[in-house]
Amino acid sequence: MQKTILKEATHIVLINSFNNFLPESKERNFILRSLKRMEIKIIKGQSKNMLKEFIHRSFMPNDINNSFKNIFYKSLENLNKTLLLNDLKQLYINRDFPVFLKKDFKIIFIKSENDLILDNESNDNFLDFLNRTLDSKPIFINLAHQGHCLNNFNLYEILFNKLND
C-alpha cells in the first residue's frame, strides 16, 4: 500500500492483525519450529502441499470456495520462492509501534474467533497495545465461525451496522 494513502487515511480496518507474530508464551517455541519447517520445505522445493494445507487451515472452520481453490492451486505453478521466504522471515521480527499508524487514527479491529493461523496472544497483544497507545480505543468486532481468511459473510454490512450503532 502506498504511504500517501495511509498518511491521508482517517480510518483503518485491521483484520486478524498482529504487530509481532510470535507470542511470548510457551506457544512461541512450537510456532518457531513450525515456521522453520515451512522454511525448509520452501528451500527444498516441497512447498506445494504445505501451502495447500496452510490455505485449508486459513479458511477453517469454513470450506474454501472452489473457484478460489482452483486459482490458488494454479498459481502454485509460478511460485516465487524468494519472495515467499522473505515474507516468512518477516514473521520472526519483533517490532515496536507500527510506523504506519498515527495516534489519531480511528481503527476497526476485526478478530476471527476460530483463527488457526494467528496465535490468539499475538492478536490480543496488538489490540491491547492499540488500546493503550491510540487517542481513541479501536472499535472491536469479534467474528464467530470465521477463520484467518474470512469467508461467506458481508464485511460491508458488518462495518455499516457497527459504525451506525
Model regions and ranges:
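Conserved alpha/beta-hydrolase "acid-adjacent" motif
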Residues: L116-S122
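Primarily recognizes the serine-hydrolase "nucleophile elbow" in alpha/beta-hydrolase
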Residues: M1-T10
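Catalytic histidine-centered segment of alpha/beta-hydrolase-like enzymes
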Residues: I117, N142-I158
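The feature captures the conserved acid-bearing segment of alpha/beta-hydrolase catalytic domains
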Residues: R95-K102
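Short beta-strand/loop motif that positions the catalytic acidic residue
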Residues: K102-K103, I108-K111, D115
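Conserved alpha/beta-hydrolase catalytic His-Asp/Glu region
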Residues: K44-Y92
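Flexible "cap/lid" loop of the alpha/beta hydrolase fold
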Residues: A9-I42, L84
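Hydrophobic/aromatic beta-strand patches that form the interior of the parallel beta-sheet core
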Residues: H11-I15, I108-I110, I141
